């Protein structure tokens, strides 16, 4: 935040470009491989872990290999799942954030933000609390919303999208829906 400004501003942005191990699709693949629903069980299962094992996070092949080894030595599944969450959080810290100072508040967006195991892993890895780690109720659609604004503001389409005003009104409304349909 700038002094005297009520709005937070984006200071920096990075995405993982090294390996698929830092992506939501990798979590999905591993959840399917071990027979756990990513939507209903994965995150909650990982919260049961007290001492997550160390799993390689830089490379999806090494991470999968570590998980298979842990299964072979009868490591509880909730510990393996938590270990994977922490591996991805450490991967973010070391490869994406690198040596940069991570300033708060931190906005966690994308579909992975719905995973309570990943939320826990990020908070613990980055040493932040609930006030410093924000998850928007629109976390899964923030990329699409940003694409709409980018396209409109840069005049990239011949027939400009006219729904941004309705979108802004909807997003800024005080009404809280569990699941909403947005008609644009």
Model-derived regions, located:
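Conserved ATP-utilizing enzyme core subdomain
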Residues: 21, 38-71
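Adenine-nucleotide phosphate-binding core of ATP-dependent small-molecule kinases
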Residues: 65-94
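Glycine-rich phosphate-binding loops at beta-strand->alpha-helix junctions
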Residues: 98-125, 136-143
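Acidic, glycine/GT-rich loop-and beta-edge segments that sit at the periphery of enzyme/chaperone cores
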Residues: 150-184
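Short, surface-exposed connector motifs at secondary-structure boundaries
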Residues: 10, 76, 99-105, 128-132
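Gly/Thr-rich phosphate-binding beta-strand-loop-beta motif of the actin/hexokinase/Hsp70
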Residues: 1-6
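Glycine-rich phosphate-binding loop plus the immediately following alpha-helix
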Residues: 9-47, 140, 149-153
